[in-house]
From Swiss-Prot:
Record's protein name: UPF0146 protein PF0123
Similarity comment: family membership: Belongs to the UPF0146 family.
Domain of life (superkingdom): Archaea
Organism of origin: Pyrococcus furiosus (strain ATCC 43587 / DSM 3638 / JCM 8422 / Vc1)
Pfam family, one: UPF0146
InterPro entries reported for this sequence: NAD(P)-bd_dom_sf, SAM-dependent_MTases_sf, UPF0146
Amino acid sequence: MEALAELIKRKVPNEGLIIEVGVGFYLKVAKKLKEYGFNVVVVDINQEAVKNAIKERIPGFVDDVFNPNLKIYLKARAIYSIRPNPEIMMALLTLAKKVKVPLYIVPLSGDVPPREMKLINYKGISVYVWEP
């Protein structure tokens, strides 16, 4: 999954905020992006997941992507999500459009993303991308 961090590094200017939505307890990509020099924030509806990220020195917010607090996302340069539930994908795309930033989704096998997203293969991982 660290290949996703490499892809974001190649595509997104390094002076910005990158937001992972639906982080859960998997922090490897967020940590790798921090190593690359990005300002990273994670978001999850699960308060325990956010507490875990903060404990690992990654800032986080509890937020619901279906009713997002746009203040969290306004300074973002990109949003990404790893294996989100299919019903969340459209909400992520709507959010990315509102704040006008690229969206990167690594799906579970067989999940169908919104039609507007383009499938790319980067170092063996499938990534759906939407760019404004």
